[in-house]
Regions:
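Primarily extracytoplasmic/secreted proteins
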Residues: 1-221, 227-241
Length: 241
């Protein structure tokens, strides 16, 4: 396996704010960082954090989210300072992966918003046909955490072969729910990720992304620890209402 999940960093706010910073401490230079911000009752327009590249953003006026990526520098410049218009409760996360290319790393992405306005318990992303050996990431943003995943002990599942990298399991109903899942593709089979909850359900949206692998294998250095969590605050991923 060329790709590996290295660390997850997150932050959240249960009160209405217009900005939130995720501190990325100890990221390995040249690793891939993917950040997601989700805002409830706000987030009409997001400002791209310095040094990050926008992948996708969407707003309904009551809920908004944005997804970004950057190649890690291994310095404090990796911190993700998210900001947006219209204050709201929020969750944000940054996930670090190794094994990526360091240029032209984002291959393709596809957003799905057709479940917004509906109350569902299952959401399937759009499908992508990847290059063998690349990384697929699926980022889920849900309007209201109380409907999608309550209490925190009832975790959301993602369909095989995807695995969850991060999710907001600690937020109250006033915060949005968000999750990020990943899969390293062994072939060119067209794939989508399905997120499921056994709760009442809510209004989800998603973006699925493909990232290129390094030509010579893993690019970062240092030990890899599966899902090491350095969360701050009450926790949040990247979704907004």
């Amino acid at each position: 396996m060329a790709f590996a999940e290295v660390s997850t960093y997150s932050n959240s706010s249960g009160s209405g704010v217009g900005s939130l910073t995720v501190t990325v401490s100890g990221a390995v230079a040249n690793n891939l960082l993917v950040g997601q911000i989700t805002v409830r009752n706000g987030g009409d327009a997001f400002t791209t954090p310095t040094g990050w590249t926008l992948i996708d953003t969407h707003s309904t006026g009551a809920f908004g989210y944005a997804t970004y990526y950057r190649i890690a520098s291994g310095t404090s410049a990796d911190d993700a300072a998210f900001s947006w218009t219209d204050n709201g409760t929020c969750y944000a996360a940054v996930v670090e992966y190794s094994g990526n290319a360091t240029s032209s790393v984002l291959v393709q992405s596809s957003e799905k918003t057709s479940d917004l306005g509906s109350t569902v318990t299952t959401h399937t992303t759009n499908s992508l046909t990847p290059t063998a050996g690349n990384l697929l990431l699926a980022a889920l943003a849900v309007l209201h955490n109380a409907g999608w995943n309550t209490p925190a002990s009832q975790t959301t599942t993602v369909s095989s072969p995807f695995s969850l990298s991060d999710e907001n399991t600690t937020a109250s109903g006033s915060q949005p729910y968000a999750a990020i899942a990943y899969y390293e593709t062994p072939d060119t089979t067209t794939r989508a990720a399905t997120f499921t909850t056994n709760d009442a359900g809510s209004e989800p949206a998603s973006v699925i992304m493909e990232f290129a692998a390094a030509a010579g294998g893993i690019t970062g250095t240092g030990a890899i620890t599966e899902g090491a969590d350095t969360s701050a605050g009450s926790g949040a991923i990247f979704s907004y209402i």
